[in-house]
């Protein structure tokens, strides 16, 4: 099993070099390299050259830290066609970067529009038609997650699409912070993990509150029909996700994939404390302490 840090809490304050050293200082062996402006930015063309890639590989060797995966985010499901075409170009470059980094796994989201799901699905499949041969040629695996505000928000929707793609190298990312979006507020971990089975190869750990609680009055948004979604990425125990069941199921399943600390809430307050707590908690509950 790989225990990784998503360094999002550090990306705006630390250089790439400082981020790698910080990861080592916190005790993590792996980095899940999420978007940052000087590497693979959110939704924009990658801003990294061969020299920076070599620098990163040297930093990783010096610290003993490894990359568990590269996490790009691009609008490959449109629904705007210009955005989709740009996303495919961005993905092709990101795959080249993964190959240069000697990383054989990328993870991402479906990245379409909640309010135009049919067009988004059509655009996503069109992008897959172009990109699947590139992934296969380069030997890169892909893990995908449903996400709030995406055209696929639910666990069932994610599993249906992963099965539709029908590639044994495309599997599921389960983000615990999205649990209540995955099944419309029920938070039924047991059922979702049983449904995923051996497709569950990647878990992002963070806690959240149930946005469906209090008859929908947990979060009050003005105007009432505003097109928004709300969730958190908190330390385990600070929200309402059933982590007892999550860890029990992962132990029963003999989960041996990637477990990533994906807490983002404490950038300005207690990032180091939170990151150390999450690593300790994951190790203890996954039987790695």
UniProtKB/Swiss-Prot annotation:
Family matches, as InterPro entries: IolE/XylAMocC-like, Xyl_isomerase-like_sf, Xyl_isomerase-like_TIM-brl
Cross-referenced Pfam families: AP_endonuc_2
Associated pathway: Polyol metabolism; myo-inositol degradation into acetyl-CoA
Membrane-spanning ranges: none
Protein known as: Protein IolH
Classification lineage: Bacteria, Bacillati, Bacillota, Bacilli, Bacillales
Gene: iolH
């Amino acid at each position: 099993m790989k225990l990784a840090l998503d360094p999002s809490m550090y990306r705006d304050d630390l250089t790439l070099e400082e981020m790698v050293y910080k990861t080592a200082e916190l005790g993590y062996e792996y980095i899940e390299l999420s978007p940052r402006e000087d590497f693979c930015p959110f939704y924009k063309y990658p801003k990294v050259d061969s020299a920076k890639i070599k620098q990163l590989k040297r930093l990783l060797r010096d610290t003993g830290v490894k990359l568990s995966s590269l996490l790009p985010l691009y609008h490959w499901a449109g629904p705007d066609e210009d955005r989709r075409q740009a996303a495919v170009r961005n993905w092709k470059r990101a795959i080249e970067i993964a190959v240069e980094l000697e990383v054989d796994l990328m993870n991402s989201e479906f990245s379409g529009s909640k309010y135009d799901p049919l067009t988004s699905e059509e655009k996503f499949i069109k992008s897959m038609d172009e990109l699947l041969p590139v992934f296969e040629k380069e030997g890169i695996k892909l893990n995908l997650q449903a996400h709030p505000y995406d055209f696929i928000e639910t666990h069932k929707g994610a599993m249906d699409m992963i099965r539709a793609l029908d590639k044994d190298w495309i599997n599921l990312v389960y983000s615990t912070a999205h649990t209540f979006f995955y099944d419309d507020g029920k938070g039924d971990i047991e059922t979702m993990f049983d449904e995923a089975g051996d497709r569950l190869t990647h878990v992002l750990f963070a806690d959240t509150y149930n946005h469906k609680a209090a008859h929908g009055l947990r979060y009050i948004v003005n105007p009432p029909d505003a097109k928004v979604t709300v969730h958190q990425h908190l330390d385990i125990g600070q929200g309402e996700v059933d982590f007892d069941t999550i860890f029990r199921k992962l132990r029963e399943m003999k989960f041996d994939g990637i477990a990533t600390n994906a807490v983002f809430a404490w950038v300005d307050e207690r990032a180091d404390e939170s990151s150390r707590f999450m690593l300790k908690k994951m190790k203890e509950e996954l039987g790695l302490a």
